[in-house]
Amino acid sequence: MKKIIFAFIILFVFLLPMIIFYQPWVNALPSTPRHASPEQLEKTVRYLTQTVHPRSADNIDNLNRSAEYIKEVFVSSGARVTSQDVPITGGPYKNIVADYGPADGPLIIIGAHYDSASSYENDQLTYTPGADDNASGVAGLLELARLLHQQVPKTGVQLVAYASEEPPGDDANLLI
């Protein structure tokens, strides 16, 4: 009987650590996160509101720099990228379009405008940085592009950065 008890004690002493410290095999997490990067969102908003500010209709060079930045991000995300001239006085303004997934079938369109407003206050022209109207929307659009690069959708997705939502254009609905 003592031998049986001793055998159980030895077995228990060896099995207990194995039971306590046993870790099941798990797959490694993907090397790239599948969520939006707060740092990248902030970087894009800062670029649009500080580096290429103002982005209003009377600052076509900054609008073009913004469009190039957006286009570069779309291209690096593996999208089929096109630009569309928007026929508005004072332009040409450009919509930047990125297509993901199948070219045929249903299409989900998500957009944000990259121009910002200007106005006259006390007979002086003022420019808004446009962080919440709509640099933050463009930042979200570009992060979505990065995420779509990681997992190609089964339904067509079109991301559109509009150039002329603010006056004098007010024509973000002009997707040609």
Where does each model-flagged region fall?
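A non-catalytic alpha/beta surface segment that caps or lines the substrate-entry region
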Residues: 47-103
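Solvent-exposed loop/turn segments at secondary-structure junctions
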Residues: 87-89, 102-104, 114-118, 164-168
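Solvent-exposed, acidic/flexible segments
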Residues: 34-41, 56-67, 91, 107, ...
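Glycine/charged-rich beta-loop-alpha catalytic/anionic-binding loops adjacent to active sites
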Residues: 106, 117-127
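Acidic/histidine-rich catalytic neighborhood of metal-dependent amide-processing enzymes
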Residues: 128-176
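N-terminal capping segment at the start of a domain
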Residues: 18-65, 77
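Hydrophobic membrane-insertion alpha-helices, especially the h-region
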Residues: 4-21
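Soluble periplasmic/extracytoplasmic beta-strand elements of cell-envelope proteins
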Residues: 47, 95-99, 107-113, 156-162
